[in-house]
Amino acid sequence: MGQQFTNAEGEQTEIDVAELQEWYKKFVVECPSGTLFMHEFKRFFGVQDNHEAAEYIENMFRAFDKNGDNTIDFLEYVAALNLVLRGKLEHKLRWTFKVYDKDGNGCIDKPELLEIVESIYKLKKVCRSEVEERTPLLTPEEVVDRIFQLVDENGDGQLSLDEFIDGARKDKWVMKMLQMDVNPGGWISEQRRKSALF
């Protein structure tokens, strides 16, 4: 029998008790104080010295910090893991929208999207294979222009939540570009491998 848990969208989901206990054990090991602070979150992702990566991780942290107290407690941790591991596409896109909307006005403008795309490009550069290295990429500005061209239905220069979700559902390229990697395992592994070499 599982525990009822309300996810970010207010829906009841069931989490297995054994799984919840395992998550708690991991949380206590990583955060003996019972709360996860920004500096610990950054350390986990190995981004203390990388400004662009730090901004990306700070945005993720703020999105997981539901009550805005600048810490992630166990319930917020469980909600984050539930989103990452089990979340429906729409929930992940809603969360991604919240991360991208840095000023919290309910819309994403070009400068906000450009900042995120540039950060993601810098983060992902580390993980590109040799074949990918030879494949020319669009510049971050070209990515943002193309996304707005495909997704900004009313042409107001801002993406609403509905435009963001609809655009991602209609176009696979847009989906790939808009859907934030909330489980950047390859990037984390690469960062840890690099730090082990020094």
UniProtKB/Swiss-Prot annotation:
The UniProt entry's GO CC annotations, sorted and at most eight, read: cone photoreceptor outer segment; photoreceptor inner segment
Which GO terms fall under biological process for this protein? regulation of signal transduction; visual perception
Instruction: Spell out the InterPro entries in the cross-references.
Output: EF-hand-dom_pair, EF_Hand_1_Ca_BS, EF_hand_dom, Recoverin
Keywords in alphabetical order: Calcium, Lipoprotein, Metal-binding, Myristate, Repeat, Sensory transduction, Vision
Q: In which tissues is it expressed?
A: Retina and pineal gland.
Question: Please, where does N-myristoyl glycine lipid attachment map on the chain?
Answer: 2
The entry's Ca(2+) 2-binding residues are 101, 103, 105, 107, 112
Question: EF-hand domain: which residues?
Answer: 16-51, 52-87, 88-123, 139-174
Q: Which residues bind Ca(2+) 1?
A: 65, 67, 69, 71, 76
Q: Which Pfam families match?
A: EF-hand_1, EF-hand_7
- Which positions in this protein are listed as binding Ca(2+) 3? 152, 154, 156, 158, 163
> Gene3D superfamilies in the record, alphabetically?
EF-hand
Query: GO molecular function terms here?
Result: calcium ion binding; calcium sensitive guanylate cyclase activator activity
What do we know about how this protein assembles, alone or with others?
Undergoes dimerization at low calcium ions concentration, while the presence of calcium ions inhibits its dimerization. Dimerization correlates with its ability to activate GC.
What more the UniProt record tells us is: Binds three calcium ions.
What function does this protein fulfil?
A: Stimulates synthesis of cGMP in photoreceptors. Thought to mediate Ca(2+)-sensitive regulation of retinal guanylyl cyclase (GC), a key event in recovery of the dark state of rod photoreceptors following light exposure.
Q: What is this protein called?
A: Guanylyl cyclase-activating protein 2
What is the gene called? GUCA1B
